[in-house]
Amino acid sequence: MNDVVKIVEDFIRPHIPQPFELFAVEWEKFGGDMMLSILVDKEGGIEIDETAELSEIISPLLDTISPDPFPTEGYLLEVASPGAERPLRKAEHFAGAVGEYIFVKLYQKINNEKEITGDLVSFDGETLVVDVLDKTRHKNIEIPLSAVAKAQTMVKF
């Protein structure tokens, strides 16, 4: 985990008011600038006006982090919802996504597949069980969390 991400995550997590929760912090290059994305959510989803209110809370807090982890040339701040197709990075993200349609990219092939899409049937903290459609029948594929390179929820059409 990037130092800026860890510092920001640890610093702002206790300041996120209920019923909201800190979903993820991202620190990435955006054009010629660096962007700090604070992804927040709540049961039932978050509204755009709520992200604006949270931005008003979070922005001044970031200015009080000492020592300052941000580059002297500044950064862009985005406070947003993780969205309908949200990233799954931590064990608690997978636990919260049980029953949802997901996309998983693997470090190495499992069942001759490096990318798997299906319904997340269960997650025990270490292994995902994904129900995939193989031609005309369903089958469950077990995926160790350590084998997951990238994952996200998907909108099923």
From Swiss-Prot:
One record GO biological process = ribosomal small subunit assembly
Which range is the signal sequence, renumbered to this chain? none
Name the UniProt key words of this record, in alphabetical order. Answer: Cytoplasm, Ribosome biogenesis
Q: What family is reported?
A: Belongs to the RimP family.
Query: What is one GO cellular-component annotation here?
Result: cytosol
Q: Which CDD domains match?
A: YlxS_C (cd01734)
Q: Superkingdom of this entry's organism?
A: Bacteria
Q: Which organism is it from?
A: Lactococcus lactis subsp. lactis (strain IL1403)
Where is it localised?
Cytoplasm
Q: Quote the InterPro entries the UniProt record gives.
A: Ribosome_maturation_RimP (IPR003728), RimP_C (IPR028998), RimP_C_sf (IPR036847), RimP_N (IPR028989), RimP_N_sf (IPR035956)
Q: Name one Pfam family in it.
A: RimP_N
Reply yes or no: does the keyword Plastid apply: no
Free-text function comment from the UniProt entry: Required for maturation of 30S ribosomal subunits.
The protein here is known as Ribosome maturation factor RimP
